[in-house]
């Protein structure tokens, strides 16, 4: 979806939009850390996030990769910066085609800074001289597909700011006229350069309106995190620093925490003033840091840590090709990135109902599904690599996870227990103690308010429902006991399969069981999570392979612990259990006296 449409839609509802900017890190570890940070920040619901294009096009490939992952894996509306520096038209079109094929609709069109080692911008052969040319090219070749954002400079472009820190009135007016040309050429949104004098920004907005620029103008806010970095950035951008800001910073410049606290205070007060003057959107330059940006938004009452809303039980995709997707199998609940990877080749995505089995079109299992950020790999090493002498030792690790003592799990891309799991963690501990090794679960829910902090989704003024669900590994003997117990519990359905494809089930292969649904005003019933045998048959390969790829392989070859884990993988069954009576049923009754 175009950012301009999202901003205008929120404005029509009387809401203020906010967004974050990130830049490509220099190291692989830095990229991993950035995506973990993005995951946390995107949970607060930014309207979009953008990723910069390195000076001189130095990060072109990485920017393209990060933008695509933001849109398709982090699931946030993404805007990619695109510059003219060192970019002949063929490279520009390659970048645009790449993001279009990945479902991205938003571009920030810039001239760009001079290449490394040069003082002035030089047009590359076969390329463009300015952002206006880039806007014209995008509109002429790609029509209305892309939303185009351009940069605005409240103090004028740094190139025309003199040694005295000011641009002449003639240069400032010329800059405004050039900005209007970019809008007239097809740009539909302006995001400004950083500033610290709010009055300058408000004057800039008024000056734009006076010459006929009517599109939204979004202020770019850069929280002060570090004194030297602040001076370096304002010096590079030739940004005016108000006297009172320097006076406040000077006594605390060597106290980094005090500088950050002042930066949060200043950013908050700047935003309050702009919001009071009718600004409807804020863009935060994060410098890949989260605390200051989030603190400002919390101070403004725009986000609340205790009320992170979800449109669905899983994060809704931002990819233009998946925006209507609203049904998924529960099996990948803790591995959403893997699910997105394995379904990226689909031409249509389920909407409203799961429909016919589509197992044949799941992507093949590959190394990609088991690749992990180094930080997560390290966490698994620290928490899960212990001497394992018996199955009881394995059970102990699962119990520790249910107790909340572990922040990682080989079967999860998420951190620790999810809020709804904590509702049933005492029962889960007992189940794991009996040798049923749980990897996925949800409690039963009967008409809980949709804004509940633990199980809510879909926004306010609705009610959500869940059937209790449990997924676990167990031995053949324990499975036989479960099957026997279920004969006296007709509301429970089960499926079980081992690595050798031996099935045990009391459901038909074509059965599709909705296990989560919601009721909202003026809408049909939404059922975003289902259980179906065909998808379970696909998932089971990934679940069994996780024993090796994400746990056993952390040990040296021939290590007894590694061998034990492989034995469990090769002999245990994966079991899916649903308690269909979500009002009076008790899924844990299956395990009583076992």
From Swiss-Prot:
Pathway: One-carbon metabolism; tetrahydrofolate interconversion
Binding site for NAD(+): 21-26, 52-53
Enzyme active site: 21 (proton donor/acceptor)
Binding residues annotated for substrate, in chain numbering: 113, 193, 285
GO cellular component, one term: cytosol
Catalytic activity: (6S)-5-methyl-5,6,7,8-tetrahydrofolate + NAD(+) = (6R)-5,10-methylene-5,6,7,8-tetrahydrofolate + NADH + H(+)
Binding-site residues for FAD, renumbered to this chain: 52-53, 81, 111-113, 153, 157-160, 175, 182
Role summary: The probable reversibility of the MTHFR reaction in plants suggests that they can metabolize the methyl group of 5,10-methylenetetrahydrofolate to serine, sugars and starch.
Name of the protein described by the UniProt record: Methylenetetrahydrofolate reductase (NADH) 2
């Amino acid at each position: 979806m175009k950012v301009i449409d999202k901003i205008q839609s929120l404005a029509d509802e009387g809401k203020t939009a906010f967004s974050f900017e990130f830049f490509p890190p220099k190291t692989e570890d830095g990229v991993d850390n950035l995506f973990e940070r993005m995951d946390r920040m995107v949970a607060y619901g930014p309207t979009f996030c953008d990723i910069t294009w390195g000076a001189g096009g130095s990060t072109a490939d990485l920017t393209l990769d990060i933008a695509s992952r933001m849109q398709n894996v982090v699931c946030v509306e993404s805007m990619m910066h695109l510059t003219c520096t060192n970019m002949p038209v063929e490279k520009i079109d390659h970048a645009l085609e790449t993001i279009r094929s990945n479902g991205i609709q938003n571009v920030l069109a810039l001239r760009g800074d001079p290449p490394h080692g040069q003082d002035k911008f030089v047009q590359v052969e076969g390329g463009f001289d300015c952002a206006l040319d880039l806007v014209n090219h995008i509109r002429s070749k790609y029509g209305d597909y892309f939303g185009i954002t351009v940069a605005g400079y409240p103090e004028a472009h740094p190139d025309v700011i003199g040694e005295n820190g000011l641009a002449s009135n003639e240069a400032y007016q010329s800059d405004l006229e050039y900005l209007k040309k970019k809008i007239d050429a097809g740009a539909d949104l302006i995001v400004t350069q950083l500033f610290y004098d709010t009055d300058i920004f408000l004057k800039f907005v008024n000056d734009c309106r006076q010459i006929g620029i009517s599109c939204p103008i979004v202020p770019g806010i850069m929280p002060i995190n570090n004194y030297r970095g602040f001076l370096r950035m304002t010096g590079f951008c030739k940004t005016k620093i108000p006297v009172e800001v320097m006076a406040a910073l000077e006594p605390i410049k060597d106290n980094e925490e005090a500088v950050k606290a002042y930066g949060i205070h200043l950013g908050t007060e700047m935003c309050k003033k702009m919001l009071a003057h009718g600004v409807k959107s804020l863009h935060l330059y994060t410098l890949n840091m989260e605390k200051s940006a989030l603190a400002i938004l919390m101070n403004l009452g725009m986000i609340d840590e205790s009320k992170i809303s979800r449109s669905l039980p899983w994060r809704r995709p931002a990819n233009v090709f998946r925006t209507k997707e609203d049904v998924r199998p529960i099996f990948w609940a803790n591995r959403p990135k893997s699910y997105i990877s394995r379904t990226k080749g689909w031409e249509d995505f389920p909407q409203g109902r799961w429909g016919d089995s589509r197992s044949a079109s799941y992507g093949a299992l590959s190394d990609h599904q088991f690749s992990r950020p180094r930080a997560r790999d390290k966490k698994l090493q620290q928490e899960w690599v212990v001497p394992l002498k018996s199955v009881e030792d394995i059970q102990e690790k699962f119990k520790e996870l249910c107790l909340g003592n572990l922040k990682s799990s080989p079967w999860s891309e998420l951190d620790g227990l999810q809020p709804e799991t904590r509702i049933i963690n005492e029962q889960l501990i007992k189940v794991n103690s009996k040798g049923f090794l749980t990897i996925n679960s949800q409690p039963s829910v009967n008409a809980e308010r949709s804004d509940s902090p633990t199980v809510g989704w879909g926004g306010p003024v609705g009610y959500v429902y869940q059937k209790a669900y449990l997924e676990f590994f167990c031995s053949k003997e324990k499975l036989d006991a479960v099957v026997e117990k279920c004969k006296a519990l007709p509301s429970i359905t089960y499926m079980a399969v081992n690595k050798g494809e031996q099935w045990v089930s009391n459901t038909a292969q074509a059965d599709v069981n909705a296990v989560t649904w919601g009721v909202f005003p003026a809408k049909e019933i939404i059922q975003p999570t289902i259980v179906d045998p065909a998808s379970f048959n696909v998932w089971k390969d990934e679940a069994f392979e996780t024993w090796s790829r994400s746990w056993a392989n952390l040990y040296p070859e021939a290590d007894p612990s590694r061998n034990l884990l492989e034995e469990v993988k090769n002999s245990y069954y994966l079991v899916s259990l649903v308690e269909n009576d979500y009002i009076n049923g008790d899924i844990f009754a299956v395990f009583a006296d076992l």
